[in-house]
Amino acid sequence: MQTATKTPWDFLSKYKDIDFSCEWPTVPEMFFITTKRFPERPCFTDFEGEGGSKNTLSYSQVEQKLKELASWLTEKGIQKGDRIAVSGKNSPQWGLVFLASLAAGATICPIDYALHEEEIKNLLNTAKPKFFFVDEEKFPTFDAQNAEYKVYSLSPKFPEKYVYSLKPNSIEHDFQSAKEDDLAAILLQAEQQEIQKA
C-alpha cells in the first residue's frame, strides 16, 4: 500500500476556493493565509524605536496596515494594472508598500535605492507610476518635482506624507487583487548606457 507523499504546500488545500481561487495563491493571498495561520507571530522588525530600540509588528498588525494602505490606494484611484514605484532601504514600510500595492491590484515597480537620483528619475519616466514611495534621503528631491506621479515617504520624518499616516475613509475587504497570471512586478534596472529598461 502506497501512502501519499506530503509536501510543504499541502496545507494550502484547506484554503483553496475560500482564500484563493486559482491553482496557486498570489503574494497578497499568501500573506492573508499566513496571517490566518500565525496572527501573532513576528512579521516585520525594525530598529527605529527610541534610541534604536527594536520594534516588531505581528502578522495581524501588518495585515491591518496593509488593508488600510490598499484601501487608501484604491480610494485615490489606483486600478488593476496601474503602477506604483518604491525605492528605499529594507524596512517594514517598504514591504508594506510592496504588499499593499499588489493587494490593490497594482503592478509594483521596485527601484534600487543605491542608484543616483538621475538614474531613478529615468526609471520613473520609463515605469510611469501613479505613486512613488521613497525613503527620507531622496524624498525632498522627488517631492519638489512637478512630476506626473505623486510622491510619498517611507520615513516618519515627513509625517504628512508618511506611508503609515495614509488612512482611508473606509477599509475595503474585496480588493482587486492580481490573479496568478497578471503582471505583479516590473523590476527596473539601470544599464551601463543611458538607456533604462524594464
Where does each model-flagged region fall?
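Conserved ATP-dependent adenylate/AMP-binding module captured primarily in the ANL superfamily
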Residues: 113-143
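Conserved AMP-binding/adenylate-forming core of the ANL superfamily
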Residues: 23, 40-91, 95-99, 116-121
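Short hydrophobic alpha-helices that are characteristic scaffold elements of the AMP-binding
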Residues: 98-104, 126
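ANL superfamily adenylate-forming
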Residues: 9, 51, 137-183
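AMP-dependent adenylate-forming
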Residues: 4-12, 30-57
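Conserved S/T- and glycine-rich ATP-binding loop of Class I adenylate-forming
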Residues: 84, 101, 132, 183, ...
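Conserved pre-ATP/AMP-binding loop-to-beta segment of ANL
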Residues: 39-42, 170-195
